[in-house]
Amino acid sequence: MIDEKIQLGQEQQQAIDLILQFLKSKDTCFSLVGAAGTGKSLTISMLLPQLDCNYQLCAPTHKAALVMRNYCDNDAITLHSMLSLSPKLDITEFDVLNLGFYMTKKPQQIPTKGLVICDEASMINDDLFDLIVERVKSYNSKILFVSDKAQLLPVQSTKYSKVYTHCDQTFTLTKIYRQSSENCILPILNDLRKAE
């Protein structure tokens, strides 16, 4: 739960303002990007009370959904659950390196004319990105991807997720709050992050 006395930084407030404008636009996809410690989680948790639409919180993994559930004090589910996807487990054709999925039913967890907020989006591969956007559009909803470009790439991929290149709008948080500016390691961490 977020303390009501917390003050957002200028960038964080700007991100919220842009997301709220995005919700009124014809665009479907917004990407909020930021390094660890820039306040992505805080920004999302402070955005939620300002939303005047239904929303669904999700993430690619159970662990990420649990973390999101804790910092937003709200239910979060996996992307696959939201999309009603189950793994294809035909034992005669099972290939651990090439797992497929099938839709078990029409997705029930995507809000109509609402917002899907997906954390840890750097892990989303091209096919899953396309499916998410297609499904969200079919419900006349919008998607907000939240990610850190220095986090995990999509599984079996050597390139960044489409969340960095195919969203209608993108905003990047740059100011790091979690580390003290006097921390002697911070410049080294920033150099490593920029090295890509």
Regions found by a protein language model. Give the residues of each.
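Conserved ATP-binding/catalytic motifs of P-loop helicase motor domains
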Residues: M1-E196
